[in-house]
Amino acid sequence: MPQRQPQPAHPADGIYFGLMSGTSMDGVDGVAVRFEAGRAPVVLAEAFVGFAQSLRDALFALQQPGDNEIDRESLAANALVTRYAVCCHELQRTAGLSRDEIRAIGVHGQTVRHRPERGYTRQLNNPALLAELTQVDVIADFRSRDVAAGGHGAPLAPAFHATVFGAPGETRVVCNLGGISNITILPGAGGDVRGFDCGPANALIDAWATRHLGKPYDDGGKFAARGTVHAALLAALLDEPYFTAPPPKSTGRDLFNPAWLDAKLAAFSQVAPEDVQATLTALTAVSVAREVAQHAPGCKAVFVCGGGARNPVLLDALRHALREAGVPATVDTTAALGVPPQQVEALAFAWLAYRFTARQPGNLATVTGAAGNRVLGALYPR
């Protein structure tokens, strides 16, 4: 008699892809991961697919209102999804998977507007096209249900962070340094998981490097390391209501963009470019450290993920800012917990796809401010 195949512990168990292109807009990170109920996720493959400068320019242009937006948005979405499909094919090849072995692709899309105070958030995407190009089920549009329930739609990663990084008896902070910085506070003994956006990170650091170096980012923080923090400029940058607003809160390029920076710099025209870069790096560190000091003063360890985890100057600035804020916490990357920092966000969206398939909530209302926990996402069948 033929042997019966072992059944999964949960009907949603299986292999999922997660795709994330963040506010840095340099490319898409992808992971292939196996989820089984009651077990730690197992990463089978990872990939990064960069965006051409023409696509980056189109995405940046859509961050602000302009003419002919519907046409430009649709064309950019199609170009974006072709890169997503390349990433999926690379994951499939690296992991040695057939299409039928992949339960679903969880794809975030590219945020071009985030205005929850007006009741909407917009992630550029064409999940129907991605399903057609990959012949795999696609789960997308994770943020809108939380916004519909009165939440900010962000951050969504804290529920995943709590599942993977939480530790009994130890208060930890997971800090994502992407285009925008955000933190997840994982209480060690009771209490709610909390999380929110702190302010700008690589969005401004990268923009300044592009303007003055002609490079997409400040490689290793070397540009910032050549400069000195300008105290008066730092104070002016921190003089922004968002930094003192209570959570739940979220932000993005709608606020923290080159136009915002230029307005702040108008009174500091004599500050050298490298000093501005050092000050932007300090801005990221100080805005995070102040929030940790206020909301997780007993934190003993901060674990960093996102692109900023590859910037040692930024990590040192964060250590210094935490000491100045009176927080005796160590700073390391999530690699110390077994998850490479470049995988964390893509893993989170694979996990959200897994949660959708199981029809389990993906948000934390205590984080986003929604009326309750909700199942997030929409299915686009293969």
Curated annotation (Swiss-Prot):
Keywords: ATP-binding, Carbohydrate metabolism, Kinase, Nucleotide-binding, Transferase. SUPFAM superfamilies: Actin-like ATPase domain. It comes from Burkholderia cenocepacia (strain ATCC BAA-245 / DSM 16553 / LMG 16656 / NCTC 13227 / J2315 / CF5610) (Burkholderia cepacia (strain J2315)). One of its GO terms (molecular function) is ATP binding. Transmembrane segments: none annotated. CDD domains: ASKHA_NBD_ANMK. It is an enzyme of class 2 (transferase). Pfam families: AnmK. Pathway: Amino-sugar metabolism; 1,6-anhydro-N-acetylmuramate degradation; Cell wall biogenesis; peptidoglycan recycling. GO terms for biological process: 1,6-anhydro-N-acetyl-beta-muramic acid catabolic process; amino sugar metabolic process; peptidoglycan turnover. Catalyzes the specific phosphorylation of 1,6-anhydro-N-acetylmuramic acid (anhMurNAc) with the simultaneous cleavage of the 1,6-anhydro ring, generating MurNAc-6-P. Is required for the utilization of anhMurNAc either imported from the medium or derived from its own cell wall murein, and thus plays a role in cell wall recycling. This is Anhydro-N-acetylmuramic acid kinase. ATP binds at residues 22-29. It comes from the Bacteria. Belongs to the anhydro-N-acetylmuramic acid kinase family.
